[in-house]
Design a protein with these regions (language model features):
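N-terminal cationic and glycine-rich segments that engage phosphates or anionic surfaces
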Residues: 1-116, 121-125, 130-139, 208, ...
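Positively charged, low-complexity, intrinsically disordered RNA-binding extensions
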Residues: 139-249
Length: 249
């Protein structure tokens, strides 16, 4: 699991405030609505919508909220046009960062992202500056205490998964983006329940951080994730688990 994924998992386990959960659900709802508007409301025919819905489910977003977001997308334009933009930059100690934004005002978003980088010891970069550090992959997390590696491997690899990696008490099934839905469906058909399932950006290499730089990096990551227009933040840091636990505490 990447350092950023570990950070997100630790924060999720420790719980978030109602305000933060509300903001997260608002972002997830926006992503679902835009996906439904652009590709239709049938999750079986709209991969982007299926991914957005799976992401919402993995974050325990209520079913009614998800259905309302889909209905809004299917109801036509509501006067608001959203644009998806990727920003790239560097955090403290040279950590590569990609920020996935969904916004109705790109000038506002650009200024906000630039200020966050500047105020937290980072630097916004030109498009392409850090994108090469990451690769787009599908990721499905399975509870390793409930299922054996052989069972997960058999279902996933036969459906086109690239690999099944053990990470602590979990198995992480990795796929190419085009195979993500098929692998997810194969796991379900095999009776294997899974947690987080998403298309994500996985770093090809990582920057190892000690506590001082780790603290600075977590501050810029948290600030970016707290921005209203930011959907996802990807970073290539590698921080020891004990330090992550202390910082999350």
């Amino acid at each position: 699991m990447s350092g950023h994924s570990k950070w997100a998992t630790i924060k999720h386990k420790k719980g978030e405030t109602d305000a933060k959960r509300g903001k997260l659900f608002s972002k997830l709802s926006r992503a679902i609505t835009v996906a439904a508007r652009e590709g239709g409301t049938d999750v079986n025919m709209n991969i982007a919508l299926a991914n957005a819905v799976e992401k919402a489910k993995s974050e325990s977003m209520p079913k009614d909220n998800i259905e309302r977001a889909i209905q809004r997308g299917g109801g036509g334009a509501d006067g608001v046009s959203y644009e998806s933009i990727l920003y790239e930059g560097y955090g403290p100690a040279g950590v590569a960062i990609i920020v996935d934004v969904l916004t109705d005002n790109k000038n506002r978003s650009a200024a906000d992202i630039r200020n966050i980088f500047s105020n937290h010891g980072g630097q916004l970069a030109q498009p392409g500056a850090v994108a090469w550090v990451f690769e787009r992959r599908g990721s499905v997390v399975v509870d390793g205490e409930k299922y054996s590696e052989d069972d997960v491997m058999a279902a996933a690899i036969d459906a086109g998964a690239d690999d099944v990696v053990q990470d602590g008490e979990e198995f992480r099934v990795l796929t190419q983006p085009a195979d993500f839905v098929a692998v997810r469906e194969a796991l379900t058909a095999a009776g294997i329940e899974f947690g987080q399932a998403e298309l994500t950006m996985i770093p090809k290499s990582s920057v190892k951080l000690e506590e001082n730089d780790a603290r600075k990096t977590m501050k810029i990551i948290d600030a970016l994730e707290d921005s209203d227009d930011v959907q996802e933040v990807y970073a290539n840091f590698d921080i020891p688990d004990d330090i992550l636990e202390r910082l999350a505490g």
